[in-house]
């Protein structure tokens, strides 16, 4: 989660102004603000993501981690027509009430009811595993 208070102090403005700036960045489609389920602006987002992977590569001064790129791709793919909230675990999102975890095809989890896995580096799906690239068709 972003430290809005520290950022406000660093740039010499109020916390409310920083939140308005962040909201302006979202409206300009430069970032996506991810909240916990049931929360929304003006509450602090749980995660701020670059709007899409093209922007991520264009403005990042470092090489982006594979997980970060895949989560950005996933969120951007489903954002337009679906409600996106942050789930409880790393890489987990709640999409229209469905828990979806973005992870590599080799990562193993215990089977859980109602949890789907958007797996990158996977060509085909099986059961609750869905290849991440298929979400690109939703955009």
Language-model-derived ranges and their functions:
Residues 74, 78, 91-106:
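Conserved catalytic cores of phosphodiester-cleaving nucleases, focusing on short active-site segments
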Residues 51, 100, 118:
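Active-site flanking residues adjacent to catalytic metal/cofactor-binding acidic residues
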Residues 1-90:
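Accessory nucleic acid-recognition modules appended to NTPase machines
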Residues 87-90, 103-139:
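Catalytic cores of nucleic-acid endonucleases
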Residues 12, 79-82, 95-98, 109-116:
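Short glycine/proline-enriched coil/turn segments at helix->beta-strand junctions
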């Amino acid at each position: 989660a972003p430290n809005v208070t520290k950022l406000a102090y660093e740039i010499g403005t109020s916390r409310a102004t920083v939140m308005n700036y962040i909201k302006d960045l979202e409206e300009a489609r430069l970032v996506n603000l991810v909240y916990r389920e049931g929360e929304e602006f003006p509450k602090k987002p749980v995660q701020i993501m670059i709007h899409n992977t093209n922007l991520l590569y264009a403005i990042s001064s470092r090489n982006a981690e594979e997980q970060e790129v895949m989560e950005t791709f996933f969120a951007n793919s489903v954002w337009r027509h679906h409600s996106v909230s942050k789930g409880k675990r790393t890489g987990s999102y709640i999409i229209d009430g469905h828990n979806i975890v973005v992870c590599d095809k080799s990562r193993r989890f215990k089977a859980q009811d109602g949890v789907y896995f958007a797996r990158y580096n996977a060509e085909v799906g099986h059961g609750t595993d869905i290849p991440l690239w298929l979400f690109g068709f939703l955009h």
